[in-house]
């Protein structure tokens, strides 16, 4: 054993001593604050670490119960949400563009051809009334044994297209196809009266011819009055009434024959 100790001493020639561990510390003996031996550090205040301000605050006490915790937010009931959304929605008839007040005013305007019409109301695209009047006209023809629904709708479409082209050429402001169809459809109301008389008596006599001519003049006068008031076509009523009379004359021929 003594030989082995001598061998280690001879082999490791160094000035390092075990007693210098607490003083040197692996080559850091020249620093201002050398490492301290184990057990001499103050662990209450760690060096180089500072906690975030929010992490060191005390926790808020839990105020809820075990089976009834305190909710983080109060959800809005579905009933109140749906009721508020339904109140904000417009009525269904308004979304469909059906206004019974305007329909009644347009009907009265047609029934009073000598009365001044409101151009702002007549300039609206309302097809609910014209569709009802077309169905009523076809129904009265059906009562006389004439199934003419196809002719009624076909002639109406062709007549609306022709009047649309003509009015756009004559007026300075222009007009939409829906407005033309609406006015011509409302002015079909006197023709329903003519076909209703055809259910009671024949329209092929002298009285029938006079009544038919009066109804054609009524329809064309109402339509031309509405067109010139809605499109500001002063002094052109006769020019507008002539093609309207041709259109309603075709409907009168269907009613008579």
UniProtKB/Swiss-Prot annotation:
Main location: endoplasmic reticulum
Keyword list, A-Z: Endoplasmic reticulum, ER-Golgi transport, Golgi apparatus, Membrane, Protein transport, Transmembrane, Transmembrane helix, Transport
Subcellular location per the Swiss-Prot or TrEMBL entry: Endoplasmic reticulum membrane; Golgi apparatus, cis-Golgi network membrane
Pfam families: Yip1 (PF04893)
InterPro entries listed in its UniProt record: Yip1/4-like, Yip1_dom
UniProt entry tagged with the keyword Transmembrane helix: yes
Any GO BP annotation: vesicle fusion with Golgi apparatus
Bilayer topology annotation: Multi-pass membrane protein
Signal peptide start-end: none
Gene Ontology CC terms: endoplasmic reticulum membrane; trans-Golgi network
Ranges in the topological domain labelled Cytoplasmic: 1-124, 168-173, 218-236
Residues annotated as transmembrane: 125-145, 147-167, 174-194, 197-217, 237-257
Topology Lumenal: residue spans: 146, 195-196
Record function comment: Plays a role in transport between endoplasmic reticulum and Golgi.
Membership in a protein family: Belongs to the YIP1 family.
Protein name stated in the entry: Protein YIPF5
Organism: Danio rerio (Zebrafish)
